[in-house]
Amino acid sequence: MAIISVAHFLHDVYSSFLAPILPLLIDKLGMSYFIVGVISMVQRLPSLLNPFVGLLADRVSVRYFLIIAPALTTISMSLLGIAPSVVVLAILLFVMGISSTLFHVPGPVFIRRLAGDKIGRGMSFYMLGGELARTVGPLVILGAVSLWGLEGSYRLLPFGLFASIILYFRFHNVHLDLLQSERPAASGRIPKALWRFFLVLLALTFFRSIMKSAFTVFLPTFMKANGASLWLSGASLSLLQF
């Protein structure tokens, strides 16, 4: 579980690279705020596949989803600085969105099957990795840009790829379907009494995500446009998500 939590941390560190360097990307590619909103939406489009990935995770071994996802996210987000056009930038973000779905949806399934009777502790470490990454990520990418420039962000590639390599050697022979067979089979049906609860929860999550995404994506850009330094803008985002 510790390895998965560390992989979750590294994955989400890379996935938080966009907002802190948006002011630089806007200057480089000449993007309007509308275009920034569009590419941010493109990054989140693969989340529409969450229900289907979840259904798949309930039926097949998910270990390769978790093994591949950190590598995909690392590659796509480390190359943001050298994207030559808005189209290439959007493609990189779309790939990152797919890899994020492949990691975050099966991740809790993986934890549940490995944690045994300590599911709560397993999920707490898993979530800690993700939450901490949102604070550290902006500082990591700004440090890289300070050292190597915007187009030197690709030098962060090895660290994230290391996570996928470790996950492969640790879990490629772990057959979670066998672990699942030791538990009573669930019917897979949601009781009718819970449907209203899930619909309300879905609505709350949807509108909360809209507000949070708009704020976190544009905060560094807004601060930079109003005279703040790039470091202060990124640090404010880190503090907000701490």
Name each model-derived stretch.
Residues F169-I190:
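Flexible cytoplasmic inter-helical loops of multi-pass small-molecule transporters
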Residues L18-A19, R196-S238, F242:
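Extracytoplasmic gate region of multi-pass secondary transporters
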Residues I4, V87-L93, L201:
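Short hydrophobic/alpha-helical segments at membrane-entry points of transmembrane helices
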Residues L92-G129:
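Cytoplasmic helix-loop-helix junction between adjacent transmembrane helices
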Residues L48-V87:
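Conserved MFS/SLC helix-loop-helix module at the cytosolic interface between two early adjacent transmembrane helices
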Residues S40-G54, S238-F242:
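Central cavity-lining transmembrane alpha-helices of secondary-active solute carriers
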Residues D117, Y126-H172:
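Helix-loop-helix hairpin linking two adjacent transmembrane segments in secondary transporters
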Residues S76-G81, M96, L167-Y168:
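MFS-fold secondary transporters
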